[in-house]
């Protein structure tokens, strides 16, 4: 089983390529958190393990990584994860709107 490491920084649209972003900005999402990356892996049915590690290039920032069973190319996997994170965020936004409407 081949594995690949995906850092939260790799999917962050606020980071430049030099700072660690690995996918095109149009696919990336801002301020990715480890728990979001874990949730995306679960929803995509990937075998993974999460690690609370610091990205070496920005060791002072919060972050983490997941070691994922490789499926296709690493770039395609990261784009798939970023899209799933964006989808999860949208679902949470809609749930918050629904809760506010119910309170009124």
Curated annotation (Swiss-Prot):
Gene3D superfamilies: Signal recognition particle, SRP19-like subunit. Keywords: Cytoplasm, Ribonucleoprotein, RNA-binding, Signal recognition particle. It is found in: Cytoplasm. The keyword Cytoplasm applies. It comes from the Archaea. GO terms for cellular component: signal recognition particle. InterPro entries: Signal_recog_particle_SRP19 (IPR002778), SRP19-like_sf (IPR036521), SRP19_arc-type (IPR022938). GO terms for molecular function: 7S RNA binding. One of its GO terms (biological process) is SRP-dependent cotranslational protein targeting to membrane, signal sequence recognition. Belongs to the SRP19 family. Involved in targeting and insertion of nascent membrane proteins into the cytoplasmic membrane. Binds directly to 7S RNA and mediates binding of the 54 kDa subunit of the SRP. Part of the signal recognition particle protein translocation system, which is composed of SRP and FtsY. Archaeal SRP consists of a 7S RNA molecule of 300 nucleotides and two protein subunits: SRP54 and SRP19. This is Signal recognition particle 19 kDa protein. It comes from Archaeoglobus fulgidus (strain ATCC 49558 / DSM 4304 / JCM 9628 / NBRC 100126 / VC-16). The lineage of its organism: Archaea, Methanobacteriati, Methanobacteriota, Archaeoglobi, Archaeoglobales. The gene is srp19.
